[in-house]
Amino acid sequence: MVDKLQNIPEETWKEYVEKAYILGDRYERQYHGCGQCVLAAIFDTLDIYDENVFCAATGLSGGLGLIGNSTCAALIGSVLTFGLVYPRRREHFDGDRENKYRTFKMAQEMQKRYLEQYGSIKCHDIHTNLMGRPFDLRDPEERSAFELAGAH
């Protein structure tokens, strides 16, 4: 998986990002769970899949278990895929420094984009920025209000 992705031209990456964004939005509207929707969109765009990573992301959505005061699961899902493309592998735990720092740089850039676009990386703060207030997604009435406010 890793080898086929590491030498993709920058212009192709831009096309992949656009396609993944469109797919992620569609998946979020249909399935909900932003962390897994981002992963699914990126997996489908890059024609890769890792069941363990996808399953491990189950509890991330809604700012970690729907609580909302943690990092956006879509951001976490994105960073997880960076590690799949440029991994620090277990068998090279003391090595893979170039990949590790490349992934760090990509994660830093993604966080910067979130801060520029949403003013925060926290789920509740992003909801407030986009919809005027945070929502307690554990509460069915709040979940309905979240949907009515334009979330998906």
What is each of the regions a protein language model found here?
Residues 40-44, 79-82, 95-152:
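Amphipathic alpha-helical interface segments
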